[in-house]
From Swiss-Prot:
Residues 65-135 are annotated as: Disordered. It comes from Danio rerio (Zebrafish). This is Unique cartilage matrix-associated protein. Belongs to the UCMA family. Residues 65-96, 107-123 have a biased composition (Basic and acidic residues). GO terms for biological process: embryonic skeletal system development; regulation of osteoblast differentiation. Residues 64-114 form a coiled coil. Residues 97-106 have a biased composition (Acidic residues).
């Protein structure tokens, strides 16, 4: 029970301080703020007349202007160029990889052939097996 009295007294002091000072008015929004939005809200929302004419300016079936057609064509061409460059780069990477693999395979084959020749060498040049004279 001893802690309830100081807690109650503290709550009353805080409540009286809030009601006496004008700083509490800033937490409440005024009607004029809603009428005149400022900052980010002004960028998001537009007047009703502009919003109505926004969709009237160009409907879905309206013909595109030449500038719009040219801009879309430039975007398409740029995308095609990026795609072409990407595929060319991938093809070059694969060709380099395949060439290195073939070179390594050729090297392994050459080494194995040399080892086989050294193992089967009989002292004759060319080797006796390949230089037989038929009688």
């Amino acid at each position: 029970m001893s802690w309830t009295q100081p807690a109650l007294l503290t709550c009353l002091l805080v409540l009286s301080a809030i009601t006496l000072f004008d700083g509490a008015d800033s937490a409440v929004s005024d009607k004029r703020d809603a009428v005149n939005p400022q900052g980010a809200l002004r960028k998001i929302f537009m007047p009703e007349a502009d919003a109505a004419s926004f969709f009237k300016r160009r409907s879905r079936r309206a013909v595109k202007t030449q500038d719009e057609i040219n801009a879309e064509q430039r975007q398409r061409l740029a995308a095609d160029e990026r795609r072409r460059e990407y595929h060319e780069e991938q093809r070059n990477k694969y060709e380099n990889y395949a060439e290195e693999e073939n070179d390594e395979q050729d090297e392994r084959t050459r080494e194995k052939t040399e080892q086989w020749r050294e193992f089967h060498y009989d002292g004759l040049d060319p080797s006796y097996e390949y230089n037989r004279h038929t009688i």
